[in-house]
Swiss-Prot record:
GO biological process annotation, one example: peptidyl-glutamic acid modification
Claim: Cytoplasm is one of the keywords in the record: yes
Gene name per UniProt: TTLL4
GO molecular function, one term: tubulin-glutamic acid ligase activity
Protein name: Tubulin monoglutamylase TTLL4
Binding residues annotated for ATP, in chain numbering: 721, 727-728, 749-752, 762-764, 809-810
Length: 1199
């Protein structure tokens, strides 16, 4: 249609099935060829009300833009049909015009006031398809002589807010032949008195219309077609441009759950002004305040089969076409589909399907709305020349004849099945959920020479087939911001429950828009932004904030499973409660088949998320299901998924906030830094432990070393990579020195020329690694991943080195290959992308031990993360207020050689979460949901958000405070914790038995860290923790500096990995007392130095090393075994009696050689504790200075 750029029609239907069949199905009663006079026809037309339009053609086909009438062999015979204004229940009319070189419109009396001009040229046959349209009518003030512009037709449409209409989707039989080159437009229905009406069609038209054909009414409602595309045939000559009259757009509501169309109730309020302005288009729609009562209702309905002939009510909206010089642009058109989608307002009324009625109240719940909105949905930005798998042959490619702009948008699909489309409000004042919004739609024509595709298969019922429309290119009218950021904001405001009115009102008053790019302003652009360009989130800025785009690729049609109704969804609590008492719960993130309950308003208002331009859609959908809102401020948000920042910028993150990056993680995220760190570890610990990374050289500094290695292996292939690139950009495979790029930083790496092949193709693995903490280090590995194949079979020949489809496995590269095959089944071993679990099944069938490969992958992942640990940990202590504030997802690219040895190729700090296939959605969707649950987002105290970060406050109305709150901890307990850490970090060569004693005494910090670890483990989902583990003690030697909490967690795992319940019960007993929060009474025992260290053999008096005041207390004790130790079961253990001078850990005699050796070690490992000997020999320390000296010695090395 002229206003939409795609094929649309309007079909009116009464609620009762009262239409009579006037003749055989598919036929039109013959009418006399007389031409009624204008004066007789128009008054007669106004007497008709609520008829049905009939398109009597079984097969209708469009004409390619590049083809003329002579090429098809059938001369065009256009037919014009004038339908009275009463054809629609609200007096709605439309104007549709085509193009023909032999036909001209000279005068159309009162066209925009009362009639529908319809013109159709049929050259070929095409099975009927889905029929969707709307009715157009202008206000009486716009009566003027009308003539068509050269290649565009202004469309007028106005609506009265006080009027509503009953609009239905229906299907009609269509008959056509090559000798019947006209389209019959009929109407049937009832007037208020119930009488059947006849059609009256007339007007002043050119001679080609003065034929014997006169369309008549046809009451036959036997068949219901899916779609009938009727494109706008553009006039090329003889037509004079005219200023477009004022119109009003239509409102189209989707239920979102089943694809059924459900317009709004009659009593729904209409915004006073909503405008849609096509930039540089043939007609402009601007804001209108039309309040004239003499207006008509505009309605739209999607064609779907309604067995019960149930009515749907469409709401009226107001809009106006604005006069513009751009209206003469012959290459632009108004896109109807996008206009009605953008202007849809709140309120969903679920229509029954298959005899099931869904209560409207379910849609008043924003949580349910979000589940419906996000279930099985992938948001796609506007795409140009987007290619889809070749096997999708069922698409309908509609071409607009005469189109001159060839943007090639015919392959993109607008999917409406199970998609909730609603208005994104950009103004949130008051309780009106339909604020005025103004946006621009940049319309584009289809490409020339595109032949219509095969007909749409009709194997499913019409109610189950998603509407397939042409793609829409959106323009920008304001600052570029992500579309789904605004959708998160509008989801809860568009649909609200009456019982939650006051909270929602408060939310509306608090304008929740996307934040100003505060974090992104300080992003390190030269750091690794791996695969951000491959993600759909990087292109979200192409959409203005008031536009909610429901564009997804055709593959979504294959993965849209039957949605669960509200009562079928699993209801989940909003919070995950801890395993331990006095520990705050974490926010729950659900799947698309779950409905997350709402928190009370006082807590729900704290759910704020900072949106970034690179926040993936799949993250937005997941947080939206948990009722997060977009924060406008920089201090009240809880989470952000954005760019990596420079390290000093992490100071701006407050204690209750989480960012998805660690400072310094680019140490493994950049290819050059990764090689430097791994080569350093290799030189320190040997190639046996660190030989999983191909030999690399960093140019220009390693040019001489590269030249030497190059000459030693003449037949060696080398792969050249930019140090901070992604998606295969700039990667080359070379074998000649002359092919090496000069004068720019590069990483030159030995090419793995003998990879493991499957069906002759090489592949790599995308492994998802999640780090929740660096101190203590906690690493998780997602159980599934992706297997990415090269799209050409591998050949070791030197002649094939330039073929990227053979040597590179990046999806961004291989998707451009015409031979690339997608895979829709996550368990199938087909196509060029598999699930990781499918690979393990494949290898198991080949007799390969996949478990052994998985264990090797775990090993290389842990070692790679440890190589970055010293940098990240030091930056965390320097710039991050609280370890809670950072977490990060890494994407490891691993390749298997012919011996199935895993090799780390690179590490991505921002792995692509773009979901372009059912396989991607299944794996990445589950992974993100489990990741966010594992992250443990905690609701802060409302006072903490407002108050200064350094203040320590509590609230009786908020959730329990963080376990890390040390405001109530006494100074002696803080001192004891530091001394214990120093005690276990000052040993040069500790053994396993010595480290095992760390669990004999638990401090408040110990309990807090172990509680966090066990709570986190219980939320792991499909993640597997690979560090710490019961075998991770072997990795402790790889740390540049020993970390006390790594020792603690590793020993805990070794002791309790086989009996988790026992360890959890022990921690629960201490949490019940509040010990993990530093709540220790005066009588509670605290940690002290082991008795074997400070035992005086003469009197067996155990000296406590806290302070002199503690010494006086010990002197008053009558017992010689009075060490204030806290054992695992909460009792005071018996001290271990050892000989004087013996230590529970191995000691080396002091020597100058030892001093030289230890001077090279980290500072924390250079000191040894003094040993006291009081058996008459000379003591290393005198008794009078023992206590203070030991205390100073320990605290001096305490981290």
């Amino acid at each position: 249609m002229a206003s939409a750029g795609t094929q649309h029609y309007s079909i009116g239907l009464r609620q009762k099935n009262s239409f009579k069949q006037s003749g055989p199905s598919g036929t039109v009663p013959a009418t006399p060829p007389e031409k009624p006079s204008e004066g007789r026809v128009w008054p007669q037309a106004h007497q008709q009300v609520k008829p049905i339009w009939k398109l009597e053609k079984k097969q209708v086909e469009t004409l390619s833009a590049g083809l003329g009438p002579g090429l098809l062999g059938v001369p065009p015979q256009p037919a014009y049909f004038f339908c009275p204004s009463t054809l629609c229940s609200s007096g709605t009319t439309a104007v549709i015009a085509g193009h023909s070189s032999s036909c001209y419109l000279h005068s159309l009396p009162d066209l925009f006031n009362s009639t529908l001009l319809y013109r159709r040229s049929s050259y070929r046959q095409k099975p009927y398809q889905q029929l969707e349209s709307f009715c157009l009518r202008s206000s009486p003030s716009e009566k003027s002589p009308f003539s068509l512009p050269q290649k565009s037709l202004p469309v007028s449409l106005t609506a009265n807010k006080a009027t509503s209409s009953m609009v239905f989707s229906m299907a009609q039989p269509m008959a056509s032949s090559s000798t019947e080159p006209y389209l019959c437009l009929a109407a049937a229905g009832e007037n208020p008195s119930g009488k059947s009406l006849a059609s009256a069609i007339s007007g002043k038209i050119p001679s080609p219309l003065s034929s014997s054909y006169k369309p008549m009414l046809n009451n036959n409602s036997f068949m219901w077609p899916n779609s009938t595309p009727v494109p706008l045939l553009q006039t090329t000559q003889g037509l004079k441009p005219v200023s477009p009259p004022k119109i009003q757009p239509v409102s189209w509501h989707h239920s979102g759950g089943t694809g059924d169309c459900a317009p709004q109730p009659v009593d729904h309020k209409v915004p006073k002004s909503i405008g849609t302005v096509p930039a540089d288009a043939s007609a402009h729609i601007a804001l209108s305040t039309a309040s004239s009562h003499d207006t008509s209702t505009t309605s739209v309905a999607s064609s779907w089969y309604n067995r019960n002939n149930l009515a749907m009510r469409a709401e009226p909206l107001s809009c106006a076409l604005d006069d513009s010089s751009d209206s003469q642009d012959p290459t632009k058109e108004i896109r109807f589909t996008e206009a009605v989608r953008k202007l849809t307002a709140r309120g969903f009324e679920k229509m029954p399907r298959q005899g099931c009625q869904l209560e409207q109240s379910s849609f008043l719940n924003p949580s349910f709305q979000w589940n419906v909105l996000n279930r099985s949905r992938r948001w796609k930005p506007p795409a140009v020349n987007q290619q889809f798998p070749q096997e999708d042959a069922g698409s309908v490619r509609r071409v607009l004849p005469g189109a001159s702009d060839t943007l090639g948008l015919d392959n993109t699909v607008f999917c409406t099945k199970r998609i909730s489309i609603h208005l994104l409000a950009s103004h949130a004042s008051g309780l009106n959920h339909n604020p005025a919004c103004e946006s621009v739609i940049d319309s584009s024509a289809f490409g020339e020479g595109k032949a219509p595709g095969p007909p749409f298969p009709q194997t499913l019922g019409i109610a189950n087939v998603a509407t397939r429309l042409s793609s829409i290119q959106l323009g920008q009218s304001e600052k570029e911001r992500p579309e789904e950021a605004r959708e998160l904001d509008s989801s809860d405001r568009d649909i609200s429950s009456a019982t939650d009115l006051q909270p929602d009102q408060a939310e509306t008053e608090d304008t929740e828009e996307e934040l100003v790019d505060g974090l992104e302003d300080c992003c390190s652009r030269d750091e690794n932004e791996e695969e951000e360009g491959d993600s759909e989130c990087s292109s979200l800025s192409a959409v203005s904030p008031s536009e909610s785009v429901a564009m997804i690729s055709r593959s979504c049609m294959e993965i849209l499973t039957k949605p669960l109704s509200n009562h079928e969804k699993v209801v989940r609590p909003a919070l995950i409660y801890s395993l331990f008492p006095n520990v705050p719960p974490t926010i729950y993130f659900g799947t698309r088949d779950e409905r997350v309950e709402k928190l009370p308003w006082e807590q729900r208002k704290l759910l704020r998320w900072k949106m970034s331009t690179v926040t993936p859609n799949i993250v937005k959908q997941t947080i939206g299901r948990s009722h997060f809102k977009i924060s406008k401020r920089n201090d009240d948000w809880l989470g952000c998924w954005g760019h990596h920042m420079k390290s000093p910028s992490f100071r701006s993150i407050r204690e209750h906030q989480k960012l998805n990056h660690f400072p310094g993680s680019f140490q493994i995220g950049r290819k050059d830094r990764l090689w430097r760190n791994l080569s350093r570890m290799q030189s320190r610990f040997g190639k046996k432990e660190f030989s999983f990374f191909p030999q690399s050289f960093i140019l220009p500094q390693d040019a001489k070393l590269l030249r030497k290695a190059w000459e030693s292996s003449s037949r060696q292939k080398w792969i050249v990579k930019p140090p901070a690139s992604a998606r295969g950009i700039g990667i080359q495979v070379i074998h000649k020195w002359s092919q090496l790029p000069k004068r720019r930083p590069l990483l030159v790496q030995r090419y793995l020329h003998k990879p493991y092949l499957i069906s002759g193709s090489k592949f790599d693995l995308r492994i998802y690694v999640y780090v929740t903490s660096y101190d203590p280090l906690r690493i998780y590995l997602f159980s599934d991943g992706l297997v990415r194949f090269a799209s050409c079979k591998y050949s070791p020949s030197m002649k094939s080195l330039g073929n990227k489809f053979m040597h590179l496995t990046n999806y961004s590269v291989n998707k451009k290959n015409a031979e690339y095959q997608a895979n829709a089944d996550e368990m199938a071993c087909q196509g060029h992308k598999w699930a990781l679990k499918a690979l393990w099944n494949y290898l198991s069938q080949k007799g390969v031990n996949s478990d052994a490969i998985w264990e090797k992958i775990k090993d290389v992942v842990v070692k790679t993360i440890i190589s970055s640990e010293p940098y990240v940990t030091s930056l965390l202590k320097m710039y991050v207020r609280r370890p809670y504030s950072c977490h990060e997802l890494f994407g490891f690219d691993i390749m298997l050689d012919e011996n199935l040895k895993p090799w780390v190729l690179e590490v991505n700090i921002s792995p692509s979460l773009h979901s372009s296939s059912p396989l991607d959605i299944s794996i990445k969707g589950q992974m993100i949901r489990d990741l966010l649950n594992l992250a443990g987002f905690v609701l802060p105290n409302a006072e903490d958000i407002i108050s200064s970060p350094s203040s320590c406050s509590s609230s009786t109305t908020s959730l329990p405070t963080s376990p890390g709150d040390k405001c109530r901890m006494a100074p002696e307990h803080v001192t004891a914790q530091k001394m214990k850490k120093a005690y276990y970090l000052t040993q040069k060569i500790p053994d396993q038995d010595f480290y095992a004693s760390v669990l004999d005494v638990l401090t408040p910090d110990d309990v807090r860290i172990l509680v966090e670890m066990e709570d986190e483990f219980s939320r792991r989902g499909q993640f597997e923790r690979i560090f710490p583990s019961h075998i991770s003690s072997r990795y402790l030697r790889f740390f540049e500096q020993p970390r006390y909490f790594n020792i603690l967690t590793t020993q805990w795992e070794q002791k309790y990995h086989g009996n988790k319940l026992k360890g959890v019960d022990l921690l629960r007993s201490w949490c019940y007392k509040g010990f993990h929060m530093g709540v220790v009474s005066d009588s509670a025992p605290v940690w002290s130095l082991p008795t074997s260290l400070l035992t005086i053999s003469k009197d067996d008096v155990i000296l406590n090393a806290f302070s002199k005041s503690e010494t006086s207390k010990l002197g008053k004790q009558s017992s010689c075994e009075v060490s204030l130790l806290l054992s695992e079961d909460g009792t005071t253990p018996k001290s271990k009696k050892t000989q004087a001078g013996l230590s529970p850990y191995p000691q080396k005699p002091s020597s100058s050689k030892d001093s030289e050796d230890t001077s090279k070690e980290p500072s924390l490992s250079t000191q040894t504790l003094p040993v006291i000997k009081c058996s008459g020999q000379t003591s290393r320390l005198s008794a009078s200075s023992t206590f203070q000296s030991i205390s100073d010695s320990l605290l001096a090395v305490s981290p």
